[in-house]
Amino acid sequence: MNKKRLLPKASLGALFMLFGTALTACSNSDFQTNLTSLNQLREGVNQNTSLTQDKKAFVESLQKAFENNPEGTTKVLLDAWKFTLLDSKILESKDPSRFVKAFGSGKSNEDVEPNASVKGLRLDKRFEPSTANIINNVISLNEQKVEAFNIQYKSRTSFKVQVKLNAQGKYQKSQVQSYLQQIGLNDGDLKQESGTLSADLIFTYTVPESNLFSRKNFDTLMKKINFNTTLKIDMVGKDEIMKKILQSTTFTNNLSSQTFQDQSIDLLPYLLYSIL
């Protein structure tokens, strides 16, 4: 009677180890083949934690994923941006350790897109430095909260991302009095020595006139994923003083609503923050 030969235990162990390695390798490359969800990317990164430690290699992997599935990869990048601001509440209560790993040292909320700071509102691009300083001196940002983040994406030539922030500020009457005429207020508008201001800020990102999102926007040298947009910022006052400032003939055309071309957003930090 013929007996089947059994593999030695050592050979079985080696076979299982080889099989496990192959499975891990497949898992690591799965998201490059057909990236369709943020959870899929998280699973791939969990299988290979070194990916997020080498940003250049990570950008290269995402570039490969984009080549295989442009729309799916772009949606994942936008979902990560939304998750970071709306779900993880990076502007309200960021995780300091994750923030440094994702955005780098020396960065702050002013480097998050969008935000309600002077930099985030592009005040330096709207006004002369002296005017921007007036606004900065009048209104001191105290709190900002992401209230909505909506994504409509069909293709790189048809998309709309809209983010609504509520910003709370404060003022000191002694500081504001020097600028009453410039900002459209009079002495009777400020009935208290100090007070709060509130506004809704709506950031709308749409298709840019040039530099549509493509493979070349995955910058492996600078370790960035540059998503170019046209940006429109609208401000809506929520209290009487803020409404009057926005209705001022001096500022109404530039402060309440303005559009900016070629506004590039590096999506890599949001992706890292959402999966770390």
Curated annotation (Swiss-Prot):
Keywords (A to Z) from UniProt: Cell membrane, Lipoprotein, Membrane, Palmitate, Signal
Keyword Mitochondrion set for record: no
Lipidated residue numbers (N-palmitoyl cysteine): C26
Entry-linked InterPro entries: Lipoprotein_3
Leader sequence segment: 1-25
A GO cellular-component term linked to this record: plasma membrane
Lineage: superkingdom: Bacteria
Residue positions of covalent lipid attachment, annotated as S-diacylglycerol cysteine: C26
Major subcellular location class: membrane
Membrane topology label: Lipid-anchor
Keyword Signal found: yes
Locations listed in the record: Cell membrane
Family matches, as Pfam families: Lipoprotein_3
PROSITE patterns noted in UniProt: PROKAR_LIPOPROTEIN
Protein family: Belongs to the MG439/MG440 family.
Name of the protein described by the UniProt record: Uncharacterized lipoprotein MG440 homolog 3
Source species of the chain: Mycoplasma pneumoniae (strain ATCC 29342 / M129 / Subtype 1)
